Design a protein with these regions (language model features):
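Non-catalytic nucleic-acid-binding interfaces of large nucleic-acid enzymes and RNP effectors
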Residues: 1-628
Length: 629
């Protein structure tokens, strides 16, 4: 449909929608620009996407230079007195025996990354001196070599290397900044008795300078210059002209692709092809029918999308378009309550505390080693708490700000797309019908259907009971529970901050959705009091209908399996069935029987009767052997 047709269909709202998308894009660009500046200022730019994409341009020439350096050391082909970098390289070759390719990659990548980190820290001139950068490269190489040597050290002790590497990688990945990653690795190695390589700063300076020399010769990225710092003339590094321009272009490209997806104020554009649908203007960027991030590389995506062109996706389009056409409004009762909770410091209704956790007081100078250890342990705990708090608080605040932004509209909509499995998802993430408890509680349907009788209130009551944690009793009992607590429900709706029964009874799982139910149920009771019955009451509260282990529901339905069907609530039953409890009970019975009557583990044997071993040299247990049960 053309611009003119959309304008004729939606009038001024279409213009407003385009303006909203344009503003959202500007906000996304500004946010990314600040993020990129922060990364550079904190000395983390060398590990990012831009650095990786630029390093590959001169990878081969730099790698060739480093290879020659490694071979020179390996063949001991150096005349006269050897510099200290030579002996450090010998250490590295010993550690990376039979892994020279890995070592050469490490030298190139670490060298470039550290140089870029230092040179783009624009506010710190001392970080650009040759000696500072050289030492930084030496330190980074030592850290990598220490980890590799630590693994070798642990292997000689018979450690489970697969678990060790996995746990180290996971713990390092969980830490945000490189300094925290390094601190963790060093502490972990020290605890296991590994002391590390004995490299001096002087030697690391010389090694780093040699790596810099090789990288300058292999690329136009950096140049050596003399700079006046304080009263001295000092050798410094600067980025070359090509590198500076290339970095700027890459940043500009990233920023131009930045986008923030928000709800729309008119029905989203209907999907008509894998690339046409959802938004109308600036938010169309990075929006497509199918989420293909999981496929990885560009070629895989191209292959997949070319095959999509040959498939009839009419049913997919129709499904998504129907979901997109569903109008919502902001639940202002919930929004106002959440704003009050947030303004008063949080810690209610799933809103995290808004004030930072207090840091520990400094230890006295005469603190014992045990007190220092305990202090560090507590400090780490507080740091983790604070990081989690900030993350939750930010997510909550973004949802509130988005809801405030759209509270004035009489209808809002959510563009949807699907993942590669065909599962449907709303594209906006700050606020959506598939979000967390707070996000869901902030949304009402814009249109409702009047109830025909008192019987129609049944599912509203069941929904309320479910949110309060009473979802395992019969429907009749759930309805009775709601009716017995009508006074509590009304009091909660009238004074949510003063009368916190709604929060206590929801057991912390769905507090805000339960409060949204309280608001709706109070309106229902007011209608009944005024009209004598529920007929004509219009409810717009979304009611949750969740599947029970939906994969097994599909299997049970396809196989006409009555036992499985009952366990996953496909067959009518007075009480809700819990497949997980059913399976757990059966397994527990087998485990008790095995403990009392079972045999020792049986092991797999080959045709010669010898016990087969796994990759770690342990006997392979005969899984599924009936004698075990």
């Amino acid at each position: 449909m053309s611009y003119e047709k959309y304008l004729a269909l939606y009038g001024d709202k279409f213009i407003q929608q385009l303006e909203l998308e344009s503003l959202a894009k500007q906000e996304a660009e500004e946010h990314l620009r600040k993020t990129l500046d922060t990364i550079k200022a904190e000395g983390e730019a060398g590990q990012g996407h831009i650095a990786s994409s630029l390093i590959k341009y001169t990878w081969e020439t730099c790698r060739t230079n480093i290879h020659a350096l490694v071979q020179q050391v390996k063949e001991n082909n150096t005349r006269g007195v050897k510099s200290s970098w030579f002996y450090l390289m010998e250490d590295l070759l010993t550690i990376y025996t039979n892994k020279e390719d890995t070592l050469e990659d490490l030298l190139v990548l670490t060298g470039h990354s550290v140089i870029i980190d230092c040179l783009l820290m624009t506010s710190k001139e001392r970080c650009k001196t040759l000696s500072y950068i050289a030492v930084a490269i030496g330190v980074a190489l030592k850290k990598e070599a220490d980890i590799e040597k630590f693994y070798q050290y642990e292997e000689t002790k018979g450690a489970d290397m697969k678990w060790l590497k996995s746990s180290m990688d996971k713990a390092i990945e969980q830490r945000a900044r490189s300094s925290y990653k390094v601190a963790y690795a060093v502490n972990r190695m020290h605890k296991e008795g590994y002391t590390g390589l004995n490299w001096s700063n002087q030697d690391m300076n010389v090694l780093g300078a040699k790596i810099i020399e090789m990288l300058i010769a292999g690329s136009d990225f950096y140049t050596l210059v003399d700079k006046r710092i304080d009263t001295k003339t000092i050798k410094c590094l600067e980025v070359g002209e090509w590198f500076a321009q290339a970095w700027q272009k890459q940043e500009a490209k990233l920023i131009s692709n930045a986008v923030k997806h928000l709800p729309t104020i008119i029905p989203p554009r209907h999907w008509s092809s894998p690339y046409d649908g959802g938004y109308y203007g600036a938010s169309c960027l990075q929006t497509q029918l199918i989420r293909l991030n999981v496929l990885g590389g560009t070629e895989a995506v191209k292959t997949y999308t070319s095959k999509l062109a040959m498939v009839d996706l009419g049913n997919i389009y129709a499904t998504l378009n129907a979901m997109q056409d569903t109008p919502f409004i902001i639940n202002k009762d919930v929004l106002n309550t959440l704003k009050e909770i947030y303004a008063s410091g949080g810690v209610l209704g799933g809103v995290p505390r808004t004030e930072p956790f207090e840091k520990l007081p400094r230890l006295p100078e005469d603190a014992t080693e045990e007190e220092i250890k305990e202090h560090k342990k507590k400090a780490v705990g507080i740091y983790k708490q604070e990081e989690a708090r900030k993350s939750k608080a930010l997510r909550c605040l973004v949802a509130l700000k988005t809801a405030e932004r759209f509270a004035e509209y009489d209808s809002i909509y959510f563009p949807w797309n699907v993942d590669y499995r065909g599962r449907c998802y709303p594209i906006p993430t700050a606020l959506s019908p598939q979000g967390d408890d707070i996000q869901k509680s902030l949304l009402l349907f814009a249109k409702g259907t009047p109830l025909a009788s008192n019987e129609d209130t049944k599912w509203l009551k069941i929904h309320g009971a479910n949110l309060s944690g009473n979802d395992k009793i019969s429907f009749k009992e759930r309805i009775a529970w709601v009716e017995a607590n009508e006074t509590n429900i009304v009091n909660s709706a009238e004074d949510p901050l003063g009368y916190q029964w709604w929060y206590e009874v929801s057991q912390g799982d769905y507090p805000m959705e339960f409060l949204a139910f309280c608001f709706e149920y109070k309106k229902l009771l007011t209608h009944i009091e005024k009209c004598g019955n529920a007929k004509g009451f219009v409810s717009t509260l979304p009611l949750a209908f969740d599947g029970t282990c939906s994969g097994l529901q599909h299997f049970s339905a396809l196989l006409r399996d009555e036992v499985g069907g009952q366990a996953v609530n496909l067959i009518p039953c007075d009480t809700v069935q819990d497949i997980y409890s059913i399976v757990a009970n059966k397994v527990n019975k087998l485990m008790i029987k095995d403990a009392l009557e079972g045999t020792e583990d049986s092991f797999k044997t080959n045709k010669d009767g010898e016990v087969m071993l796994d990759k770690e040299g342990k006997p392979q247990v005969k899984y599924g052997d009936k004698t075990l049960a």
